[in-house]
Amino acid sequence: MPIATVNPANGETLKTYDALTDEEIEHRLLLAAGTFRTYRTTTFFERARLLQTAADLLDADRDDIARVMTTEMGKPVVAARAEAAKCAKAMRWYAEHAQELLADEHPSARDVEDSGAVSAHVRYRPLGIVLAVMPWNFPLWQVVRFAAPALMAGNVGLLKHASNVPQTALYLQDLFRRAGFPDGCFQTLLIGSRAVEGVLRDERVVAATLTGSEPAGRSVASIAGDEVKKTVLELGGSDPFVVLPTADVAKAAKVAVTARAQNNGQSCIAAKRFIVHTDVYDEFAELFVSGMRALRVGDPMEENTDVGPLASEQGRADLEELVDDAVECGATVLCGGQRPEAYAKSGWYYEPTVIADITQDMRIHREETFGPVATLYRVGDLDEAVTLANDSPFGLSSNVWTHDAAEIDRFARDIEAGGVYVNGMTASHPAFPFGGIKRSGYGRELSAHGIREFCNITTVWVGA
């Protein structure tokens, strides 16, 4: 079945590609396996030089690849350029730090002696071929945050990207090739979802990482579990954004707009549930709704556009279904809640939306809203805020706005999430681990924790 790239701003099919045949997939697996045998022996210096070159090339390509991303999945071109810059920065960070992150670890002399050894240490060795199943919403960043540490660790990668961003997927393969990495180090597999199982079950593939939906994560985890292969999953999120009385409410409301509307609202780490103390609720709600109304919806190729189209027609339909269900169940739409009139017949647009009077029996309370839709809650104290924040199947990240040290400590202690961001919005950075709990997945990306996920952590014990 052909793989098509469609412009979500107008529904135009830009390009189509033939999916790889079984023979072509086998060729890529053979190439990856052969490459790993030699690439795993390269030095950190050699790998860092290649990754630095890739970063330089990406910087030079920034405008071009930004336009590709925008036409493939609809993010504003300004945000696409920022994504490319972030990827280059992450490449340079891992090129600089990988050697220290994977340095041999030496137990204390006392522990070595107690074990009966003359010497002992822990070594981080590459695993082999890692399959990366990646989503469309950050088509460069999601891949680079896997590829940069994996390649620096001495692994090789196979990318099965989302089927609506094949141009970006092929660009990434070409980027690493132009940087000087051996051809089998990083390969894009233009395949449909049904072909993933065969690749993952292949004995040459030793591990998999997936960023995407819960159903996709369940499928990959099930197959990998059957084959006893390591996996890292980063799935959905419905992050709480809690505002307490000592917060700078004006700043919190301004950041809330960015946190909800970034990437057209299609971000797993976007704040989605806004939980506000009653003492500052009215002030926050007024500022937040005003900010959401002021967002410029339009052509994502225009420099002044804040919110472009959703990535697919089905994605918009799913979002509309959640909003309509909430309204039917008694929720109040404070702004938005419909397709913008100017784009009613062109593209997959949806107005920035704020909904209040949410109850816990509504679907919108339990499910992830993947688009520019915010739910607004009023609470009476911190206990109620934490309880409501944790009332979700997801546990990716969280935000709290307060200048009370005791509240910060309490929130960080009791929130069920992989991240806590105080007086700021959630954002990933190569120095800090990223990942979630509950149905948001398991394992970590980025930082020392991320690069070690796909390493064979080896104990070397030497006796007399």
Language model region names:
Residues 108-251, 379:
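Rossmann-like NAD(P) dinucleotide-binding subdomain of oxidoreductase/dehydrogenase enzymes
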Residues 11, 32, 47, 69, ...:
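Residue-level signal for inorganic ion chemistry
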Residues 10-16, 205, 242, 296, ...:
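Conserved C-terminal structural/oligomerization subdomain of aldehyde/semialdehyde dehydrogenase
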Residues 1-118, 311:
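N-terminal Rossmann-like NAD(P)+-binding subdomain of aldehyde/semialdehyde dehydrogenases
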Residues 36, 40, 55-62, 66, ...:
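Structural signal for hydrophobic packing residues in well-ordered secondary-structure cores
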Residues 156-158, 333, 419:
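A short hydrophobic/small-residue beta-strand
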Residues 13-20, 35-41, 131-132, 241-243, ...:
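Short, well-ordered beta-strand elements within core beta-sheets of diverse protein domains
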Residues 14, 215-359, 422:
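ALDH superfamily catalytic-core signature
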